[in-house]
Regions:
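Mature catalytic domains of secreted/periplasmic carbohydrate-active enzymes
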Residues: 1-153
Length: 153
C-alpha cells in the first residue's frame, strides 16, 4: 500500500496557490520618490504623489507576461501605508496624492479582481516610523490593528 500522507495536508485553496503560475511583487511607496531601497520612516509623506498611477496598467502587464497573481508591499519598513490607515499619520492620507483620499491597495485590488488576477499584500512587521516600535505589547496591538484594518476593508 502507498505510504500514509504526512500531515498537514494543504487544503484546496492552498493547493491551488501552490500550483499557480508566477507571482509579481510590487514594491512601491515613498522610497519610489527618494530613490532609496529602505526608508527611515522620516520622509515627508507629501513626497508620495504618483499623479500618473494606473494600477490597471500594472495588472495588464503582469497578466501579459504570465503572472497569475500579484503582491503589493502595503507597508514597508519605513512604516508608510499605501492605504489610508486609521492607526498612523504616515500613510497616503497624509500625502497630496488625490488630496489625501487615495488608496493604492484598493485601486490595485479592484484592478486585479476585474482582470481575474490574484492579490496578496505584504505588511512589514518592522516599522521605523511608529514611536511604539520596540515596546512589544503596544506595537503588537498596533500591528494587529493595522493588519485587521488592511485585511477586512
Amino acid at each position: 500500500p502507498p505510504p500514509l500522507p504526512i500531515l498537514p495536508l494543504p487544503n484546496a485553496f492552498q493547493l491551488q496557490w501552490q500550483k499557480s503560475n508566477m507571482a509579481l511583487f510590487f514594491h512601491f511607496g515613498t522610497n519610489t520618490f527618494t530613490d532609496s531601497e529602505w526608508g527611515t520612516g522620516h520622509a515627508d509623506p507629501t513626497i508620495f504623489n504618483p499623479t500618473k498611477l494606473n494600477t490597471s496598467q500594472w495588472i495588464h502587464v503582469a497578466k501579459e507576461y504570465g503572472f497569475s497573481r500579484v503582491l503589493l508591499t502595503a507597508k514597508h519598513h519605513d512604516g508608510f501605508c499605501l492605504w489610508p490607515s486609521e492607526y498612523t499619520d504616515y500613510s497616503v492620507r497624509s500625502s497630496n496624492w488625490r488630496n489625501g483620499n487615495g488608496d493604492v491597495v484598493a485601486d490595485l485590488a479592484a484592478a486585479a479582481k476585474d482582470a481575474g488576477v490574484g492579490l496578496g499584500v505584504y505588511l512589514s512587521p518592522w516599522d521605523r516610523h511608529e514611536e511604539c516600535y520596540g515596546d512589544t505589547l503596544r506595537y503588537n496591538q498596533h500591528y494587529l490593528a493595522q493588519m485587521t484594518e488592511l485585511l477586512t476593508r
